[in-house]
């Protein structure tokens, strides 16, 4: 029993995070030097994200009997994303208004160091709607894979899958090659995941070493408020959706606990994307649904980021005594409904979108970003964890809506009654 515990990725990552926190706290200079370990692990993951998405989507779409099913899945997924993301934005807006973590700070925006956030503000200038849509279209196929842009790779994979499906039996050889290549890629993922404890240790040691526990205490009210909001969202909102779909949110969280710990250590939900594709398929969701919903969700279904954006924007308004009446808050909500769709599931993207939002709204000081720059790294953990759970739940819900969910397999796996790989008849 003890041997199996020590060998489990869950235990190893949890232990690595704890050691990283201790090292960063007691030896901050050494902790900061551990940054390459975390960065290296995330880069290894990003290295295989593009081929994983390509193989999963192509084989999923090409293997479907009807192309109408693909269109239906995409439409249902986008509808779900929009509804749940809007709920997340509204919840964040309500709670930050009730708790008011920034009230009484009386910060003069003129005294803030605008240089500290200049790089984010500059990046935010390119976050327009048209720019976002145009960025989905790659300049070249090779460029899409080289940059690792999820939506660009997804677009090419969908087109490739459609074209391969139309070839029929003539494309069977290509289909078999891609499916075999997919197995090789997942073999690489298994090797990379053995390094997850090292990556989590390095990332956590760097975070605590660089920013210190003092940063947490200084703006602790906002951090606590945000974490509690994310927990409530997962338990109440996603929990209710899960219950209505026929499964327990707590059993699902237990099922993806290793992925959650990896995300906790790296602060990026993208680091668990390859394993989530595999795990959601083993949970009973058809491959074509998983291949479409998970990658798309990384740009359109970021529940944790949505909560963060409304809370952070209103917090800055409260701290700087900027006017924020009901009209301004509705305007903020409308802007965020659009700008939040450009936030990929990578560390720092939420901060860039926040800068873009403050610029678009107009009456909020962009320099106010300096207030939360130091604690953004600590808040990114809750963002990433909520995003991951949200995308997992979305996949199951969409799979059920389009009748591509194996209910018995879902129930068996979550209740530990069957091996992950066992198959059952699809139920509608």
UniProtKB/Swiss-Prot annotation:
Subcellular locations according to the entry: Cell inner membrane
GO terms, biological process: DNA damage response; fumarate transport; L-aspartate transmembrane transport
GO CC aspect terms: membrane; plasma membrane
Effects seen without this gene: Cells lacking this gene are only able to grow after a 2-day lag period on D-malate as sole carbon source.
Induction: Subject to CRP-mediated catabolite repression. Repressed in the absence of oxygen, induced in the stationary phase and approximately 2-fold by citrate and C4-dicarboxylates.
Transmembrane segments: 5-27, 47-64, 77-99, 141-163, 184-206, 219-241, 326-348, 352-374
Topology within the bilayer: Multi-pass membrane protein
Keyword Protein biosynthesis: no
Gene3D superfamilies reported for this sequence: Sodium:dicarboxylate symporter
InterPro entries, alphabetized: C4_dicarb_transport, Na-dicarboxylate_symporter, Na-dicarboxylate_symporter_CS, Na:dicarbo_symporter_sf
Reported function: Responsible for the aerobic transport of the dicarboxylates fumarate, L- and D-malate and to a lesser extent succinate, from the periplasm across the inner membrane.
Record family assignment: Belongs to the dicarboxylate/amino acid:cation symporter (DAACS) (TC 2.A.23) family.
Protein's name in the database: Aerobic C4-dicarboxylate transport protein
Taxonomic path: Bacteria, Pseudomonadati, Pseudomonadota, Gammaproteobacteria, Enterobacterales
């Amino acid at each position: 029993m003890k041997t199996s515990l020590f060998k489990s990725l869950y235990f190893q990552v949890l232990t690595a995070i704890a050691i990283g926190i201790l090292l960063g706290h007691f030896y901050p200079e050494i902790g900061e030097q551990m940054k390459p370990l975390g960065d290296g692990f995330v880069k290894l993951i990003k290295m295989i994200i593009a081929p994983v998405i390509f193989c999963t989507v192509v084989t999923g779409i090409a293997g479907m009997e009807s192309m109408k099913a693909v269109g239906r899945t995409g439409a249902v997924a986008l509808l779900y994303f929009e509804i749940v993301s809007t709920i997340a934005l509204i919840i964040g807006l309500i709670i930050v208004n009730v708790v008011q973590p920034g009230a009484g700070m009386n910060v003069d925006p003129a005294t803030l160091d605008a240089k500290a956030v200049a790089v984010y503000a500059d990046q935010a200038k390119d976050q327009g709607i048209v720019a976002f849509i145009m960025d989905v279209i790659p300049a070249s196929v090779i460029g899409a894979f080289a940059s690792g842009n999820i939506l660009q790779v997804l677009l090419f994979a969908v087109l490739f899958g459609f074209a391969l499906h139309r070839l029929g039996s003539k494309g069977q050889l290509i289909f078999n090659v891609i499916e075999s290549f997919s197995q090789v890629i997942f073999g690489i993922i298994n090797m990379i995941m053995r390094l997850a404890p090292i990556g989590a240790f390095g990332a956590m040691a760097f975070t605590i070493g660089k920013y210190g526990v003092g940063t947490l205490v200084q703006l602790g009210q906002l951090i606590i408020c945000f974490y509690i909001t994310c927990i409530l969202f997962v338990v109440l909102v996603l929990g209710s959706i899960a219950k209505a779909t026929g499964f327990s949110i707590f059993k699902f969280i237990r099922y993806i606990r290793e992925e959650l710990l990896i995300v906790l250590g790296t602060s990026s939900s993208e680091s668990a994307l390859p394993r989530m594709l595999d795990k959601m398929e083993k949970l009973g969701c058809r491959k074509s649904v998983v291949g479409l919903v998970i990658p798309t969700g990384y740009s359109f279904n970021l529940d944790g980021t949505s909560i963060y954006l409304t809370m952070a924007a209103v917090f800055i308004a409260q701290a700087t005594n900027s006017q924020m009446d009901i009209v301004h808050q509705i305007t903020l909500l409308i802007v965020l409904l659009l700008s939040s769709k450009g936030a990929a599931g990578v560390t720092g993207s939420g901060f860039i979108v926040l800068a873009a939002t403050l610029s678009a709204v107009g009456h909020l000081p962009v320099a106010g970003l300096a207030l939360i720059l130091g604690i953004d790294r600590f808040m990114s953990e809750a963002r990433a964890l909520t995003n991951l759970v949200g995308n997992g739940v979305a996949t199951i819900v969409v799979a059920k809506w389009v009748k591509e969910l194996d209910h018995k397999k879902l129930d068996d796996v979550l209740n530990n009654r069957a091996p992950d790989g066992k198959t059952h008849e699809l139920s509608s």
